[in-house]
């Protein structure tokens, strides 16, 4: 009896001590060792602008986390890059591999065959890259491992670092779309999931209610110091400038934008459109996965990929860029064609300049944008947004205040909204001012990094409590 009493007393005081330690850790967190894994397609260039949305997100978060923690970023090694280097407080470790063309070919072939899961979610997808990263982590363990999308490699990371907390960063909606049993087994190796929007979070929680408490929205952000409104322009006669930023592809609804712009441009000789981004097409297996519960949207995209093998080879492999671009050009009349400018990929400085000159950003996506970085960039630049009312975009755009939202696939609604906004310059300016205020308040990288840091701390502190209680 005495032994039992003493044992209970010890357990009681151990629990109190663990809670005290946890509170101290939350009030004054000790630096954590954090590893952030980048996608295999996107090299990281120290101290410079990054290419690819996931690389941008990872780098912006890493810069802020490194102010208080030890951060290592893992990335593919591009020609001429050092194997490792240090930039300010960030350690960059790079992994070399040579099978990039193989994986691109496999992704195209899998898309044609309609394989599920898509190649991007298969165990073969850039496997040598992720296994090399896991090997590096085994030699350089961390408290928290943060990696994007490819949860098929979570078990490899867990084996490399059994005590590390594994955080999966979802930039798309795969948790609501991939095979349930496959995901359930893979999620067993994940300690927490962070997402870019409530849209992704809510759908993941609904499908996996047992993991709901471990799924968190951290959002993305924008550098409000670099993306800023331009000085007010005069009310004199000038061109009205529309802007599109993103991949020039069917899923982004650029063909719908061409139709709507052509209608407006026939009526308004003062309107022009600039499109920023590469022309290309997502693999159809990925498109069909993310739209597998949306037959209308998926059916609208099928013709761009071709039904026969010859059509597929022509459109998606040999003529991926020229095929879609030709279809876009065909939707423009001679009166409007000269006022549409495809500028391709541009530098960050040029992108900022284009935002500063724009009157309206138009993003008529057909697939459900999980977030929409161009929307945040546009709002920070004081430019209102006209976008599809789906995915995570409605979380960014305050309807009627910072822009307008229209139904997907509805060219008439897109055209009418464009006419409505372009006919009232003062309204556009008021919307732009409201967009800037909203971006400063809700859409900063600092806010996203703080949310992510809280997730990390909760995971690490809970592990400390468990170890203290056991001890």
Residue ranges and their predicted role:
Residues 384-387, 397:
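Short hydrophobic beta-strand element within catalytic cores of glycosyltransferases
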Residues 16-81, 88-91, 164, 188-191, ...:
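N-terminal subdomain of nucleotide-sugar transferases
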Residues 199, 221:
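Carbohydrate-associated surface elements
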Residues 399-400, 404-411, 420-425:
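Conserved acidic donor-binding segment of nucleotide-sugar-dependent glycosyltransferases
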Residues 124, 426-461:
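A charged, aromatic-enriched C-terminal amphipathic alpha-helix characteristic of glycosyltransferases
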Residues 356-370, 383:
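Acidic donor-binding loop of glycosyltransferase active sites
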Residues 277, 286-349:
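Nucleotide-activated donor-binding/catalytic signature segment of Leloir-type glycosyltransferases, i.e.
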Residues 194, 234-252, 257-262, 273-281:
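Conserved donor-binding/catalytic core segment of Leloir-type glycosyltransferases
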């Amino acid at each position: 009896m005495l032994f039992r009493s003493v044992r209970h007393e010890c357990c009681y005081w151990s629990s109190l001590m663990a809670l005290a330690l946890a509170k101290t850790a939350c009030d004054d967190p000790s630096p954590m060792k954090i590893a952030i894994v980048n996608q295999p397609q996107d090299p990281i260039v120290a101290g410079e602008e990054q290419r690819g949305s996931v690389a941008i997100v990872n780098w912006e978060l890493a810069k802020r986390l490194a102010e208080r923690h030890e951060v290592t970023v893992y990335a593919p090694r591009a020609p001429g890059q050092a194997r490792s280097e240090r930039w300010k407080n960030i350690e960059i470790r790079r992994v070399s591999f040579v099978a990039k063309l193989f994986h691109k070919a496999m992704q195209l072939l899998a898309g044609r065959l309609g394989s599920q899961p898509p190649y991007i979610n298969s165990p073969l997808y850039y496997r040598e890259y992720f296994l090399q990263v896991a090997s590096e982590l085994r030699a350089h363990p961390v408290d928290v491992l943060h990696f994007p999308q490819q949860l098929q490699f979570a078990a490899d990371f867990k084996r490399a670092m059994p005590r590390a907390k594994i955080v999966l960063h979802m930039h798309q909606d795969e948790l609501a779309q991939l095979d349930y049993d496959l995901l359930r087994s893979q999620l067993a190796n994940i300690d927490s999931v962070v997402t870019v929007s409530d849209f992704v979070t809510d759908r993941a929680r609904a499908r996996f209610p047992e993991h709901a408490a471990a799924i968190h929205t951290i959002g993305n952000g924008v550098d409000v110091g670099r993306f800023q409104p331009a000085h007010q322009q005069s009310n004199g006669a000038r061109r009205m400038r529309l802007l599109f930023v993103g991949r020039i592809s069917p899923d982004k609804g650029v063909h719908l934008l061409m139709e709507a712009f052509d209608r407006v441009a026939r009526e308004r000789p003062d309107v022009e459109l600039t499109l920023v981004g590469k022309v290309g097409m997502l693999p159809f297996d990925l498109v069909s996965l993310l739209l597998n519960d949306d037959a209308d949207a998926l059916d609208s995209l099928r013709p761009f990929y071709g039904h026969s093998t010859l059509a597929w080879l022509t459109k998606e492999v040999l003529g991926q860029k020229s095929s879609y671009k030709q279809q876009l050009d065909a939707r423009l009349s001679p009166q409007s064609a000269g006022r549409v400018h495809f500028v391709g990929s541009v530098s960050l400085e040029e992108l900022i300049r284009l935002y500063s000159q724009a009157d309206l950003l138009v993003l008529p996506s057909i697939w459900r944008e999980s977030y929409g970085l161009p929307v945040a960039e546009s709002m920070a630049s004081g430019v209102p947004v006209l976008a599809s009312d789906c995915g995570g975009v409605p979380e960014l755009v305050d309807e009627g205040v910072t822009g307008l939202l229209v139904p997907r696939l509805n060219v008439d609604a897109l055209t009418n909204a464009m006419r409505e906004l372009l006919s009232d310059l003062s309204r556009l300016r008021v919307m732009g001012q409201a967009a800037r205020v909203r971006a400063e308040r809700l859409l900063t990288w600092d806010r996203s990094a703080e949310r992510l840091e809280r997730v990390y701390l909760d995971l690490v502190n809970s592990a400390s409590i468990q170890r203290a209680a056991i001890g």
